[in-house]
Design a protein with these regions (language model features):
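Tandem CBS (Cystathionine beta-synthase) repeat/Bateman regulatory domains
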Residues: 1-309
Length: 309
């Protein structure tokens, strides 16, 4: 019997909400609540509907961001494109149907598509004057890892990410161990899993990262960034012999995974997680006990652990 998983983003939402559908924020969030302006990333440029998927991947890779706003000619936010939208389009989900309908066979054709055809329209975004607790409430309710921010006159101003929020909220000692907030159900692949299957798992199960485990031994980690970097750095053109989409989807996880995986103990303090994530420039850590992967902890887990009762 096949187990049907609830996408992680939905489990996370339910985990941190009260019965009335609102998060129960700790007093420390209100006492330290800042203006959004110092927290937003202004270095992530917007794109327009005619920007190609390739150019979008280049920006995501170079700017280390998984969300880019799509703006109108006047600078208003009209859509967003995320790394997972691109993974979906490349073979992970419903957006891939556009490839079949268009008859694309080469990776060049696939990556030359305008993002306007796969972006999310009418996106959730916040005004620069929105209180942080309201932003967090939105992020929790909708499972968002980043949101575009508009200026007072509704012009794109930047992006607010979980990483920037975590940086602000981090303190020297929290007193909450990793095992209290980590996700225990770790979905994994093996090193011979095809990229097509791994992308399908990411989209259908609502995860952005998959540990790679062979015979109970941790071999690496496959993340959205591995896929985006493969394209954004143009390495994809070096490893595909004929430049065909089917070659790309047939790649093995081991061809692009990260082998140097950052780990942490289940008894470590949340503050140690924040420090390790910032130091390693990653978005998650695997939780390992006596050589066995027992969980995973992300920027989102740290934030919620810090501010939600």
């Amino acid at each position: 019997m096949v187990k049907v998983y609830t996408p992680r983003r939905l489990r996370e939402k339910n985990r941190w909400l009260r019965s009335d559908g609102k998060p129960n924020f700790k007093d420390r969030l209100y006492s330290r609540e800042p203006e959004l302006s110092p927290l937003i990333r202004r270095d992530v440029p917007p794109i327009n509907t005619l920007t190609t998927v390739l150019r979008t991947c280049e920006l995501m890779s170079s700017q280390n961001t998984r969300l880019i706003a799509v703006t109108s000619g006047k600078g208003n936010i009209i859509g967003v494109i995320t790394a997972m939208d691109i993974v979906d389009y490349l073979g992970g989900g419903s957006r891939h149907g556009l490839v079949s309908v268009s008859g694309f066979e080469t990776i060049h054709e696939v990556l030359n598509l305008n993002v306007g055809k796969i972006m999310s329209e009418n996106p959730i975004y916040v005004n620069i004057n929105t209180p942080l607790h309201k932003v967090l409430e939105l992020m929790i309710n909708y499972g968002l890892g980043a949101v575009p921010v508009s200026s007072e006159d509704d012009i794109y101003a930047g992006v607010l990410t979980e990483l920037e929020i975590m940086k602000y909220l981090s303190v020297k000692y929290v007193g909450i161990p990793v095992h209290k907030v980590m996700t225990r159900e770790v979905l994994s692949v093996n090193s011979s899993t095809s990229l097509e299957e791994a992308m399908w798992m990411m989209i259908s199960l609502g995860v952005r990262r998959l540990p790679v485990i062979d015979h109970n031994e941790l071999k690496g980690m496959l993340t959205w960034k591995n896929i985006i970097d493969l394209i954004g750095t143009h390495k994809i053109y070096e490893i595909l012999r004929y430049g065909l989409l089917r070659e790309f989807k047939s790649l093995r996880v081991s061809d692009i995974m990260t082998t140097d995986v950052d780990i942490i103990s289940p008894d470590a303090d949340l503050s140690e997680v924040a420090s390790a994530i910032l130091r390693a420039a990653t978005s998650s850590l695997l939780v390992v006990e006596e050589g066995v992967v027992v969980g995973i902890i992300t920027e989102r887990d740290v934030i919620y652990g810090l501010v939600v009762s």
